[in-house]
Structure formats: C-alpha cells, structure tokens
Regions:
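Glycine-rich active-site loop/strand segments that organize a redox cofactor
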Residues: 1-24
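A short alpha-helix-loop-beta-strand transition element characteristic
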Residues: 15-18, 32-49, 89, 173-176, ...
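Short beta-strand to alpha-helix junction loop
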Residues: 16-26, 63-79, 91, 153-161, ...
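Glycine- and aromatic-enriched mobile tails/lids
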Residues: 34, 40-61, 210-226, 237-240, ...
C-alpha cells in the first residue's frame, strides 16, 4: 500500500488529495476481487499466480492485466453480467443531452448555490430522435473523458466530454481541466478517429524509445529512461520531434523475446503487422496523443458532485486521486472504487427522495436545415485542430489567448445554430466539445506554475 501511495503522490506532483489516494489504494484490492468473481480474467503464470506488470513511474510490479486489452476484458465481463440482471434497464443508442435541475422549472441556478438538485436527465433516442425525460432519485455520470477535443487521441469517438459539459451547464463545479495527460506512444499514422495505443506495458517489458538513427534519448530527460512518468516522456518526445523536425520517434522492441512479446501483446503485434511493421525487425513509429483528463467534475470521497443527487465516477470525475498527472493504470482502480462508493452512498438516501410531479418536456423548437450540417462538421474539425496545435503538451500565453479568441467565435456560431436547428447528437457533441475546450483553455490561463502534465513555456 505504502509504495503504491507514494508512487501516486509523486506522479501527481504535489496536487493529489492524500485521503483520496489512501482510499483508492486500500479499497482497490477488494474491488478487484469482486470483478474477478463477476468473470474478469486476468493473466496468470503457469503456477496459477497472477502476472503483475510494471508501467511508467511504478516502483514495483503490481498491475493486473489481460494480455494487451485489459479494459476490453473488464467491459466484456461487466456487460455480460449486467445483461443478466432483471432490475436494470439498458438504453442503448441513446444520447444524454442535459441534466434536469431547478433551472428547467424557471428558477435561477448559480454555481454558488448549495441547494441545486438534479432530478434526472434529458436523453435522445437515436432511433427516432425523440428526447425523453428520465426522472431519477440519483444520477451518476460515468461518461468517460474528452480526448476527442484533440485531433490526435487514443480515445474512442464518443469521448467528447459530454458528462463534464452537462454538469458544467447545470452549474456543478469543474476543476483541474488544464491537466490533460498525453500518452507518449500512440502508433504514428493510425487511421480513423482514434489513434492506436502502444501500451505503456510494452516499455515495462523492455522496449526503448529511440530517435530515427536508433539512438536512445530518454536518459537525457530522466534517470528512469523510457519508464519515466507519462508527462516527462511525452514532453521529451515532443522536444525531440520539434528539435529534429520529425513527426514521430521510435519504440524499439527488436532486442526483446518476440515469441513472448506476441503472447503478452497479441493485439499490438497484429496491428503493427497490418501497418507493415514487424516488431522483430522494425522499430515502431510513435507520437504522443491526448489520452486522459486528470480533472473533471468536482466530487468528494463518496462520488458526490456539488449538485445534490448528482454523482460521478471514472474519468469524468475530479476526485483528487490523480493531481496534476495520473499514475499509469490508476484510472481503472479509481473507477471501481468510486462506483462502489457512489452505490453505497445512494443506497443510504434513495428511499427518502421525492420526485417532482411533472418534469418539463424538452423544448423542440427549431427547424432542421440540411445545409447547416457542413457547419457542424467544419466547426468540430476546427475545434480539434485548434486544441491540438495550441493547447497540446506544451502551451504558451500567446497560444492560450489566440485559442480563446477563436473558440469564442466558434461558440457563438454553434449556439446560434443550436437555437435555430432541431437537436442532433452531432450538434450536441459539438456543444459539449466547445464547453470542455473552453474549460481547458480558461483553467490553463489561470494555472500559474508548471505541474505534472501542464507545461507553459512562459512559466518555465
């Protein structure tokens, strides 16, 4: 426990909440046992003991994994389990639009009120575009991150910051959005909306970051070399790329046991082959990509936001665990611990909830104009390019000012479109991306020292 706690605090660069770190580290093992009982299969050695991996900034082997797709394995087993439960209704192909508060009853809701209530959410059925009103005694945001506000990201297409944006519009407190973690090693040249991730565990297995002429460079930046924390590695790669005028560096696995590599990382091995890269003979071209949002909706030790009956867990929440930089693999542990804590707290008060008699219907004014779809697509691309070019690994005061100015114009255009056009998930996601981008920019402007993932050259 103590080593894990210290590693987390060091990675967080003095901005972790120590009590939250203690809770997650100490409660994590019990939560892991629960998901194993639900069917999650972590890799074991021939003796039947769990294989523990090591990743950047960890001082010991402690990471459970399922080959190179641990997240998928956890999702697979939990979805399978939840489909067996008669008391759970799953709404697939639905898009959360907004949280319902007193605002929708005509009251003025401000961020400094302590009696704001969440009554549920407006949700769009994507099969018929009808907006439903869902009443709830407790609402839990578990919507993930916002990597899609960047042009290059490891996040799936749905990671548009919807939960943070909805909570912010509902007047919940949101903080630490300036701390965006960039994964150092996304496969350069990945196709589609999502960059393919070359797991940190590959470096834990012994792969070495090198320049195009096959020279290691990480020792110049940190004595831990290729296993330094993600913020240090990402910044080092960014520096090497800019100083050499290249768009990527390389990850060298050629000296490793390739048969063992294939067993441990079958997806990575096969994907590299699809791109014409044989890891036994070729170095893997990699570049940093937006990966994880260390900030989010402020929540306490029970996952409660600053809005009554609104909870959050996972990447959407700012629990205080990660501080200025997340320790590799702590995210899955945090999600498990806070999902359990949200449930325990909700269970204590759910029977006392009295729902309002009539939630107002979603206002459907506006006309769909097919000509305007091009504006939505254009503005989405512009937001992603703006964030990638100006609000990336290294920032500056001038870039922050320019991005704020341009985002304001995009925001005004999009809000005008929102007022005159029937709602669509594409328009809803664009609004959310703009809200989240604005929070990242504004909180970056307020940050007056370089910490963890945040680096402003004017503060160096």
């Amino acid at each position: 426990f103590e080593k894990h706690r210290k590693d987390t605090l060091i990675a967080g660069d003095g901005m972790c909440e120590e009590e939250i770190v203690k809770i997650v580290v100490e409660e994590g093992p019990d939560r892991l046992r629960e998901i194993v009982d639900m069917g999650v299969r972590f890799d074991k050695d021939p003796n039947g003991d769990y294989q523990l991996g090591v990743e950047g900034a960890h001082s010991a082997k402690r990471i459970l994994h399922h080959q190179d797709m641990t997240g998928y394995e956890i999702q697979r087993s939990l979805v399978k389990k939840i489909r067996t439960l008669d008391n759970v209704n799953i709404l697939e192909h639905h898009f959360a639009v907004d949280l319902i508060t007193q605002h929708h009853f005509g009251e003025k809701v401000t961020r400094d009120r302590n009696d704001t209530q969440c009554y549920g959410a407006y949700v769009m059925n994507l099969e018929n575009n009808q907006v439903l009103k869902l009443s709830a005694g407790a609402t839990v945001l578990a919507s993930g991150g916002a990597g899609q506000v960047y042009d290059l990201t490891t996040n799936p297409p749905v990671a548009t910051g919807d939960g943070v944006a909805m909570a912010y519009r509902a007047k919940a407190e949101v903080s630490h959005m300036q701390f965006i973690q960039f994964h150092p090693t996304a496969l350069y040249g990945s196709k589609g909306d999502r960059a393919f991730l070359i797991s940190e565990a590959v470096r834990g297995f012994g792969a070495i970051l090198k320049t195009g002429d096959a020279k290691p460079f990480m020792k110049k930046y940190d004595e831990r070399g290729s296993l330094a924390s993600r913020d240090i590695v990402a910044r080092a790669i960014d520096t090497e790329m800019k100083s050499r005028g290249t768009e990527h560096v390389y990850l060298d696995c050629r000296h490793l046991d390739i048969d063992e590599f294939r067993k441990k990382f079958p997806t990575i091995y096969d994907t590299c082959l699809e791109y014409g890269i044989d890891v036994a003979e070729d170095m893997i071209p990699v570049a940093p990509a937006a990966h994880y949002m260390c900030g989010g909706v402020n929540s306490d030790e029970w996952g409660r936001s600053t809005i009554n009956r609104l909870y959050c867990c996972g990447e959407v929440a700012k629990t205080g665990l990660h501080g200025a930089n997340r320790l590799a693999s702590n995210s899955l542990l945090e999600a498990l611990v806070f999902a359990d804590r949200c449930f325990r707290d909700i269970k204590k008060s759910i029977d006392d909830y009295e729902a309002p008699r009539d939630l107002p219907d979603w206002k459907t004014e506006g006309t769909t104009d097919p000509k305007e779809w091009v504006l939505i697509n254009h503005n989405r691309k512009e937001v992603k390019q703006l964030m990638n070019n100006y609000i990336g690994i290294v920032r500056s005061n001038e870039r922050l000012k320019r991005s704020e100015k341009r985002l304001k114009v995009i925001h005004e255009e999009t809000e005008q479109l929102y007022k005159t056009t029937t709602l669509s998930p594409q328009l809803g996601e664009l609004r959310n991306m703009i809200n989240v981008s604005w929070l990242i920019i504004r909180q970056s402007m307020e940050q007056q020292e370089n910490r963890g993932t945040f680096y402003n050259i004017d503060l160096a």
